[in-house]
Amino acid sequence: MFQIPVQNLDNIRKVRKRVKGILVDIGLDSCKELMKDLKSFDPGEKYFYNTSWGDVSPWEPSGKKARYRTKPYCCSLCRYSTKVLTSLKNHLHRYHEDEADQELMIPCPNCPFSSQPRVVGKHFRMFHAPARKVQSYTVNILGETKTSRSDVISFTCLKCNFSNTLYYSMKKHVLVAHFNYLINSYFGLRTEETGEQPKASDPVSVDKILPFDKYYCKKCSAIASSQDALMYHILTSDAHRDLENKLRSVISEHIKRTGFLKQMHIAPKPVTHLALPPNSSAPSIAAPPPCFQLALPQNSQSSGTVQSVTVTPGTSGSLTHSPPTTAQSHVALVSSSLPVCQSSLSLQQSAPPPVFLSHSVALNQPVNTAVLPLTQPVGPVNKSVGTSILPVNQAMCSVNQAVRPGLLPLTKPMGPMNRPVGPAVLPMGPSVNSGVLQATSPGVISVGRAVPSGVLPAGQVTPAGVIPGQTATSGVLPTGQVVQSSTLPVGQTAPSRGLPPGQTVPLRVLPAGQVVPSGLLSSNQTVPSGVVPVNQGVNSGVLQLGQPVTPGVLPVGPPVRPGVLQLSPSVSTSILPMSQPVRAGTSQNTTFFTSGSILRQLIPTGKQVNGIPTYTLAPVSVTLPVPSGGGLAAVGPPPQVPVQFLPSGSGTQMGSSLPSLPSPQVLVSPAPSVFVQATPPLADANQALKQAKQWKTCPVCNELFPSNVYQVHMEVAHKQSEAQLCQVCNELFPANVYQVHMEVAHKQSESKSSEKLEPEKLAACAPFLKWMREKTVRCLSCKCLVSQEELMHHLLMHGLGCLFCPCTFHDVRGLVEHSRTKHLGKKRLSMDYSNRGFQLDLDANGNLLFPHLDFITILPREKLGEREVYLAILAGIHSKSLVPVYVKVRPQPEVAPKIPNKQKLTCPFCLSTFMTADAYELHLKERHHVMPTVHTMLRSPAFKCIHCCGVYTGNMTLGAIAVHLLRCRSAPKDSSSDLQVQPGFIESSELLMVNGDVIPESTFPVKRKLPEGHLGPEDQRDGEEPQLTLDADASSGSEKGLGAVPLKRQKSEIRTEGSGPSEDSLQALALDPSKYEGRSYEEKKQFLRDYFHRRPYPSRKEVELLSSLLWVWKIDVASFFGKRRYICMKAIKTHKPSVLLGFDMSELKNVKHRLNFGECESQKL
């Protein structure tokens, strides 16, 4: 760039000096004026000394700039930051308790954003407001529409693989299913009863029974009006963040990225219901979609004509009739995704129609027309109901429930407080939580316990005052009791079911020769011999199959315990008058099965569902009673109904876990009769439902069964061979041998176990382990899977770390002693663990709690001591699993000393037999150059070399011994007879040694034998050392002796086993390696380092010579030189080399002539 030169520099410099002086004078005058102002205002020395430069110069940066924190959750009160919101809350609670309300942060439920509650609320209204969502569609070339892509966030339980999209549901599942022992410490129930008793006519007083503060939290004394409200408080309140840490530790979050969802091309047709004109006395009411649909033949129609009856889920229980249609009748209760009390039920006639009973059926709605005798009572029922069936055109009353009468036309007059129920009400019973048939004990099928009640003959109205002063649940009227027409007093329960014609009474034995009292039957009905009231002394609880029943009414009494309910087919296939009794002997094909005999007929279907086998049981026969009109009972051939039992569950949890946890299906086909056992009351049923979710493996046949089916399977399949597991040696023994085994084998251990000491409970850290799955862990250091048997040996090999200090222990005794002496009384973890969410379960006294045991292992008594040790092991600070793994370590039982018998010892290599152990060991030393030993870490029998004491690992063969002897430095190198191995021994030995155990070679996969001297690609790629065969005169290294060795190794061995290197080849080396042949590895490494300084780029011949003379692998020598060259080149690039010349550089500057340095010998630096 061209610039005009400046002229008149002297003048410019003079003016510049003058201008500078003027500016100095102006500045000085300004400072003097400012000083006068400051003197007029004197705040005092206190403010002067307390003022810093940052106060008067805010525009300049004061102090060092704070480092940016990359973690999402940062504390504004200090420099703390974390990745987990819970850790930030714990930090605020611990260090900033006073300012915690200022720094309280909550996450957005729809996105990762988190901030203060006010900011999050504003953010939610701006970005996630529940406004009208405009569905965006994309149209492809064909004109088809696709919805936009959406991501679904799901949570999974690490304990049982239960998944849900709601975080609250997951926390509730984990608390109820896996941390149920913590519920009692939070849930509180007030037991104070209200003073006045509420009246039935006062609806307001009913609400006073359950006060709004009936439930409360034991931790923070918060009150709740219901269990759900209390559960919501416990799981969402900030006061219980410690509980959230425990629950969050077993919850895994997954983001499922779903692609474009294709729309359905054909819309499903809506289900239409045709309604009849309503009756004059019962106006129809519009209702939401029905939960039950019944189609049954009417009285005046043929069996092929069906009338559809719809029961709406409304509170009024109204029914709408549909016009009759011609169809076949069948009954199906099908599982659906509807809410509770919603399902569908239709009835047609087919052969054989299935009956499906699922967990979502709730039969608490009255249903018109015919009924099913095989039902499961579901839902809360406030009145006692019976197990019989009310006939058609029979009305029924209920006084314990307030309902609106007048919804259905009544065929008979009722009392003033009667509840009208349609003819042939579907039978109901006490609630058992779900309408599922489940097998709860061997040989029986649980249906649900229903308290029976009295029944009425067809066409008779229930009188209100039948049994004065007592309830009608017994079903028996005193002899001579007159039926009165009055209302039933409050507190009595009326029978809810009648007995259809041809149906046997499913409870209790009726002695013959008894007469039914007149208060139960109408005047035109008789009772044949063999039918008696229930109040006669009978203890069996089972109705005999040979006893027929009239179409009239039989009293049924409540069983004392859950009895056996029998379902039998119809007694006849003809038309019987209503007044004609059923004669004895009409049911001839019924047989009496003993308890448990039905499930002995387990027939495998050959199919599997997710690896679980399915079975088929014996058939069951169910009679569908068909009511008749005009005094005649038209009883057709009974349709045989196979019942499929589906797994039962409760609530949303079971509905969500059913798809992920399939259960074996038990199909019951038609049979003459079947026994059904009623389930116990509500508490026992809940326990049975919990047991149905557990799976057990049969120790005999190694099959997987649910816990309830497992009991049946053990009784049916293995009844003859009932085996018991010995808790000491973990072996199965028959029942008759188990007691003898315990007395003989473990007599000393049992006597000592009676004096059991208190177990030690410790917590430790194992950062090298990663918990993979049940009973299996992975060692990150060894990169291998560790089983339950090897777990403790592996832990002690790497060492267990103390949670309170950096100490590491390789024995359990040292860890126990260290915990007693150094950390006695310490209950809280260090900051490294607590900040990352690690927590240990402690009781009220501060002792460790072990809610379950993941591993049970055994250690020798000399390493463990006499006490059992419970270990809670954390998988390191940086582990993703925050739940400790609980391990129980038991001392190895002292087995009674066995009497030494004279057993022959067999050599595993040459199959020679010896009578004494000394002769056996001498043979191994002289013949095979090995001696027996025990593996140091695995504690398993092994062999070691007698020359170098190295322990053989892996597959122990004669070929491996021969190869080792060629490489062994301590073994003699001559060709004497003691080092020669006979080829016949190698060829004839078909045994392999794996960790000292003799295993026949036939158990391993057999390879095709190749011709001698042939080397295939598989042999060349094999990583293991192959067998080596030597001849008697193998000194020359013939081809026969080297036939099993790879070609490259043969060449290298031939070169190394020949005569030593020549003098010419040694001249090619920069240094002589002959004196380092027998030196240690470090000395050889130092020689190679010196050789590298002389020649950093050795030739291939030099590398081979160094490898053969130093007895080092050639690849090791080459890699050593390459590594050193890389280090030097990297150092040259990063560091500037400097040379010290040996004289003063200041004096060198005075030298005016050139410097010439001559060549000199390089010295070793």
From Swiss-Prot:
Expressed widely, with the highest level in the brain. Residues 1009-1024 have a biased composition (Basic and acidic residues). Residues 303-327, 1005-1068 are annotated as: Disordered. Residues 1090-1132 bind DNA. One of its GO terms (biological process) is nervous system development. Transmembrane segments: none annotated. Pfam families: ADNP_N (PF19627). It comes from the Eukaryota. It is found in: Nucleus. One of its GO terms (molecular function) is zinc ion binding. Its main location: nucleus. Residues 303-318 have a biased composition (Low complexity). There is a cross-link at residues 146, 1009, 1048 (Glycyl lysine isopeptide (Lys-Gly) (interchain with G-Cter in SUMO2)). GO terms for cellular component: nucleus. A zinc finger (C2H2-type) spans 73-96, 106-128, 155-178, 215-240, 696-718, 724-746, 777-798, 800-823, 905-935. The keyword Metal-binding applies. The keyword Chloroplast does not apply. Keywords: DNA-binding, Homeobox, Isopeptide bond, Metal-binding, Nucleus, Repeat, Transcription, Transcription regulation, Ubl conjugation, Zinc, Zinc-finger. May interact with SMARCA4/BRG1. Belongs to the krueppel C2H2-type zinc-finger protein family. May be involved in transcriptional regulation. May play a role in neuronal function; perhaps involved in protection of brain tissues from oxidative stress. May be involved in erythroid differentiation. This is Activity-dependent neuroprotector homeobox protein 2. The lineage of its organism: Eukaryota, Metazoa, Chordata, Craniata, Vertebrata. The gene is Adnp2.
